[in-house]
């Protein structure tokens, strides 16, 4: 397969992003070129066997992957990995799975995880929808995090946004009862779409009430995407949803929930 991530003639990772043959769907991402440093290449060469999960299209036993029956947290589109690394450092009791299609970001996080001596983080370099559909069992996830997904701000591109009704229904299936969905965006229009979709999704309950959001929770560090957006005058919206029908865990709008222990 031809690797889509060539840049400056650099050799690219031996575990490239792959697209399942014979499938056509609207993608929520583009395969952007980016500089791939020698250190990031070494990370793929040397660290992928330890931290990487190759997409196979077959159901995966996550407890066997991590060697323990701990709660599982999935971050979709982890970018440079800052939030995922922070979470793993401060929450060793849970296992973390990250999905990202941008190879340099994956390489950077691989090096960071090695520096940290992390043992409870695994990464996919693949399309999140295919991973969820084919490799993650229903009810397997304690939490799903989606921080600053591509806003596709042009009206004609809105259909490419990740948060769509079918995707929300997929997340409900993969979350356990009582599980949590945490989404964040710095685009007001995307926040509106997230409310339109997620508030209407059966099985999801907005902790802050309809069209509500909370202050940035302690478990999400301020990212460079967020900082950039604030410099441009954008607001930031953190949306928390429980995968349950009860309303006992609702938060007041703008009030940050306690960080997990």
From Swiss-Prot:
It comes from Xanthomonas campestris pv. campestris (strain ATCC 33913 / DSM 3586 / NCPPB 528 / LMG 568 / P 25). One of its GO terms (molecular function) is tRNA (guanine(46)-N7)-methyltransferase activity. The gene is trmB. It comes from the Bacteria. Its EC number is 2.1.1.33. This is tRNA (guanine-N(7)-)-methyltransferase. Gene3D superfamilies: Vaccinia Virus protein VP39. HAMAP family: tRNA_methyltr_TrmB. S-adenosyl-L-methionine binds at residues 75, 100, 127, 150.
């Amino acid at each position: 397969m031809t690797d889509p991530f060539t840049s400056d003639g650099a050799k690219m990772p031996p575990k490239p992003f792959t697209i399942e043959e014979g499938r056509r769907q609207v993608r929520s991402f583009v395969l952007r070129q980016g500089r791939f440093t020698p250190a990031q290449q070494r990370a793929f060469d040397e660290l992928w066997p330890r931290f990487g999960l190759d997409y196979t299209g077959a159901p995966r036993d996550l407890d066997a992957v991590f060697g323990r029956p701990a709660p599982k947290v999935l971050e979709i589109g982890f970018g440079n990995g800052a939030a995922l690394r922070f979470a793993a450092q401060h929450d060793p009791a849970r296992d973390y799975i990250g999905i990202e299609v941008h190879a340099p970001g994956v390489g950077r996080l691989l090096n960071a995880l090695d520096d940290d001596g992390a043992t409870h983080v695994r990464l996919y370099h693949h399309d999140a929808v295919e991973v969820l559909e084919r490799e993650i069992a229903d009810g397997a996830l304690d939490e799903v995090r989606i921080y600053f997904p591509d806003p596709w701000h042009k009206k004609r591109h809105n259909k490419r946004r990740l948060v769509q009704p079918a995707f929300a229904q997929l997340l409900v299936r993969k979350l356990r009862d009582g599980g949590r969905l945490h989404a964040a965006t710095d685009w007001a229009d995307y926040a509106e779409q997230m409310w339109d979709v997620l508030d209407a999704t059966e099985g999801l309950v907005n902790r802050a009430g309809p069209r509500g959001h909370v202050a940035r929770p302690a478990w999400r560090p301020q990212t460079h995407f967020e900082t950039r957006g604030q410099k441009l005058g954008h607001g930031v919206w953190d949306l928390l949803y429980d995968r349950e029908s009860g309303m006992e865990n609702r938060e007041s709008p703008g009030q940050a929930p306690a960080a997990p222990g």
